[in-house]
Curated annotation (Swiss-Prot):
It comes from Kluyveromyces lactis (strain ATCC 8585 / CBS 2359 / DSM 70799 / NBRC 1267 / NRRL Y-1140 / WM37) (Yeast). Belongs to the DASH complex SPC19 family. Residues 68-153 form a coiled coil. It comes from the Eukaryota. This is DASH complex subunit SPC19. Component of the DASH complex consisting of ASK1, DAD1, DAD2, DAD3, DAD4, DAM1, DUO1, HSK3, SPC19 and SPC34, with a stoichiometry of one copy of each subunit per complex. Multiple DASH complexes oligomerize to form a ring that encircles spindle microtubules and organizes the rod-like NDC80 complexes of the outer kinetochore. DASH complex oligomerization strengthens microtubule attachments. On cytoplasmic microtubules, DASH complexes appear to form patches instead of rings. One of its GO terms (biological process) is protein transport along microtubule to mitotic spindle pole body. InterPro entries: DASH_Spc19. GO terms for cellular component: cytoplasm; DASH complex; spindle microtubule. It is found in: Nucleus; Cytoplasm, Cytoskeleton, Spindle; Chromosome, Centromere, Kinetochore.
């Protein structure tokens, strides 16, 4: 009988060891899925606990905080853009005027007594620059006509 009890105790000990091994293996494999399930449940709980009113209120508070900042940034951006646009127009005008001056010097190397007008840079539109080009060309034509009349005499 002692022998049977001893075998029973040994079998029970082996069974407990096997059960402990199974528990450690199942704990390791389910640990990841448990963390995932807990995270999903927490996310679900957050949405269940927060009422729609609280969400709308938080959204409005956020808009009240961020809207003025966005308006400031938008106005700064508009000012910078306006400044860059003026600078571009000025550079374009300077380029056009220098191009006209260069063309004037190339076409009239003989004329020393006629000086070109001083370049005054002001804010102008594309149409004004076109008008200026036309006037410069007209001036050049008139100077050539004057030269021709002087040569005829």
């Amino acid at each position: 009988m002692e022998e049977v009890l001893s075998e029973g105790v040994d079998a029970l000990a082996a069974c407990v060891d096997d059960m402990a091994k199974c528990l450690t293996v199942s704990k390791v494999t389910t640990d990841r899925s448990t963390k995932l399930a807990i995270n999903m449940l927490q996310t679900k709980r957050v949405f269940q606990l927060v009422s729609e009113y609280d969400v709308q209120r938080a959204r409005l508070d956020l808009m009240e905080d961020i809207e003025p900042l966005l308006q400031k940034l938008y106005s700064k951006l508009e000012k910078a853009l306006t400044k860059l646009e003026r600078e571009r127009a000025t550079l374009s005008q300077t380029f056009e005027l220098n191009k006209l001056r260069f063309n004037n010097q190339e076409s009239n190397p003989i004329i020393d007594n006629v000086k070109s007008d001083p370049v005054v840079i002001v804010s102008s539109t594309h149409e004004e620059l076109e008008r200026l080009k036309d006037l410069k060309n007209r001036k050049e034509e008139l100077i050539q006509r004057i030269q021709e009349l002087h040569e005829e005499r």
